[in-house]
């Protein structure tokens, strides 16, 4: 099983943000913190698979993540708005948060 390399306390903060802002959304992590080739300064790459709510904005979600106490950079995008080739790469290895 693929693992997300994030401390439990940081994962809890992220899950709390997602639960409060977009409880119906599915959030995927991918990249070095999933593949295992990360270091302490690595960012966390994430995508929103689907907001399931037209009133939610990726910009607002980014701001909530940036305002959190998580001590590393995070990047989040909408999966459906990424190029097909990038979606294919993400689908090879990801973790649902």
Regions found by a protein language model. Give the residues of each.
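Catalytic core of pol beta-like nucleotidyltransferases
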Residues: 1-26, 34-40, 49-97
């Amino acid at each position: 099983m693929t693992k997300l390399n994030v401390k439990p306390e940081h994962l809890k903060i992220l899950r709390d943000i997602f639960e409060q802002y977009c409880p119906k959304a599915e959030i995927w992590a991918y990249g070095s913190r999933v593949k295992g080739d990360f270091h302490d300064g690595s960012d966390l790459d994430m995508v929103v698979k689907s907001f399931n709510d037209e009133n939610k904005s990726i910009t607002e979600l980014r701001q909530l993540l940036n305002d959190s106490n998580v001590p590393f950079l995070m990047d989040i995008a909408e999966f459906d708005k990424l190029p097909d080739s990038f979606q294919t790469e993400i689908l090879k290895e990801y973790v649902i948060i």
